Amino acid sequence: MQCSIKQILSDATDKLNKIGISSPQLEARILLQHVINKPIEYLLINLDEQLNEAKIEAFEKLLARRLKHEPIVYITGVKEFYSREFIVNKHVLIPRSDTEVLVDVVFQCHSRESGNPEKKQPNPCFRGNDISENCNDKFLNILELGTGSGCIAISLLCELPNANVIATDISLDAIDIIKSNAAKYEVTDRIQIIHSNWFENIETQKFDFIVSNPPYIAHSEKSEMAIETINYEPSIALFAEKDGLQAYFLIAENAKQFLKPNGKIILEIGFKQEEAVTQIFLDHGYNIESVYKDLQGHSRVILFSPINLNRSYARRIGKSLSGVQKNLLDNKLPKYLFSKEKLVNEKRKVFLEIGFGMGEHFINQAKMNPNALFIGIEVYLNGVANVLKLAGEQNITNFLLFPNNLDLILNEIPSNSLDGIYILFPDPWIKNKQKKKRIFNKERLKLLQDKLKDNGNLVFASDIENYFYEAIELIQQNGNFEIINKNDYLKPHDNYVITKYHQKAIKANRTPKFMILRHVLGDH
């Protein structure tokens, strides 16, 4: 029995249409071209050609599979991704065009860091030579977690000849597929494929990029999904615990030890997950560098970088960090590390303390004002650890810490955003040639004034009399401030606690003085 191409396609289109296939005619053509191994164009110009019984029977078998809602790419065994055709089967997630945004972001980051920053947003249309020709020869190490078919890893290798990739997957069946795809595109010498549950079997080494399209669908969303996806794609690549967020928690908790100092994490997310995923990474001490949208305008890929704890500013006076202190800095500090993203949409009053020492005043202010947010700056890591200890003991959480130099944070704080600033007993830098190092100087006063809201308060305290009165003179000459307590500099501000430093000053016959300022309306 023979039948024409036209009749075969017509009958198949009708059957596919009846079960709700969105593009029945196209899918009928794809199945038939797969059987006869000819391009679709051949079918269209040879509609009257008669096919023999063997080919008709082969076509009917494939059509029967599609009529059961098996994805057409599993039937044909291939799927295009980033202008290349990848081998796929039921053991790997079907590559989606949305995931191409992730590949674009890697290329853009590499291009920017290589000295070609002209592309500000990933362009879904640029491919291949557009990137490799613009990038320098910097050697790249990339880790992909949960590689599946390998479409991400292999696309990166094909476009970046100076890259090596380690690709992991928990499924041995998936690993067979990525090996086939790596061989197909001749990149086996630059890819190491590891059977691993996330980071478990990865030797300690450092990567420029960690990338992943992890499972991110909540189990509660199954009822909303297509039959093709639910019944045929591997559930381990689709669904995750913790409302679909489990993988993001795991990556946030473990990735830092595998990143180079300027390394990046680039992750695909569900289109409703931007807020939840960014919060996970903020809580674990990462910067949110950029969020990228897919062609439908949904947030699809996020670029993260770790907030590196720069300990070079720490003053090791007396003794080095204890084991308890190191544990606090390593395990508790990331949650409370300052980043500008944490101030976005902040509705509470916000106060900044510069140089909080051992943190007695800082913690007391946070305790007495639980509905406000306190940001603390301190380069002395023993003091940072002590704040974390005191906060844990008193269940205080309304604070952020920046264990680094003041000048590195000022540009991160928005103008007109602070309700108050505390500068208590800063280093006076007595010698004339050192005075430019003072926290309270003309240049910084201008910056601090810009950050304060109108009517916001700035409190300055010092036990060095010359410094204190020089500060008053500085205010009178350069600041848009009103001195509230000009008749009584000995009286501290509200909720002040006498710190150990204050006590030492009194024992040394030095008198602590306080200047309480109100920022008056002026130009920012």
UniProtKB/Swiss-Prot annotation:
Enzyme class: transferase
Region: tRNA (guanine-N(7)-)-methyltransferase, residue numbers: 307-524
HAMAP family tied to this protein: RF_methyltr_PrmC, tRNA_methyltr_TrmB
Ranges in a coiled coil: none
Family to which the UniProt record says this protein belongs: In the C-terminal section; belongs to the class I-like SAM-binding methyltransferase superfamily. TrmB family.
Record-annotated membrane-spanning stretches: none
Protein name: Bifunctional methyltransferase
NCBIfam families: hemK_fam, PRK01544.1, RF_mod_PrmC, tRNA (guanosine(46)-N7)-methyltransferase TrmB
Catalytic residue list: 427
Source lineage: Bacteria, Pseudomonadati, Pseudomonadota, Alphaproteobacteria, Rickettsiales
Presence of keyword Iron: no
Gene3D superfamilies per record: DNA helicase RuvA subunit, C-terminal domain (1.10.8.10), Vaccinia Virus protein VP39 (3.40.50.150)
Catalysed reactions, as listed in the record: L-glutaminyl-[peptide chain release factor] + S-adenosyl-L-methionine = N(5)-methyl-L-glutaminyl-[peptide chain release factor] + S-adenosyl-L-homocysteine + H(+); guanosine(46) in tRNA + S-adenosyl-L-methionine = N(7)-methylguanosine(46) in tRNA + S-adenosyl-L-homocysteine
Annotated keywords: Methyltransferase, S-adenosyl-L-methionine, Transferase, tRNA processing
Region listing for tRNA MTase, in residue ranges: 311-524
Region annotated RF MTase, chain positions: 1-308
Its job: Methylates the class 1 translation termination release factors RF1/PrfA and RF2/PrfB on the glutamine residue of the universally conserved GGQ motif. Catalyzes the formation of N(7)-methylguanine at position 46 (m7G46) in tRNA.
GO terms for MF: nucleic acid binding; protein-(glutamine-N5) methyltransferase activity; protein-glutamine N-methyltransferase activity; tRNA (guanine(46)-N7)-methyltransferase activity
Domain of life according to the entry: Bacteria
Region (HemK): 1-306
CDD domains: AdoMet_MTases
Binding site for substrate: 213-216, 431, 463
Keyword Transmembrane helix assigned: no
Residues the entry annotates as binding S-adenosyl-L-methionine: 146-150, 169, 198, 213, 353, 378, 405, 427
EC number in record: 2.1.1.297, 2.1.1.33
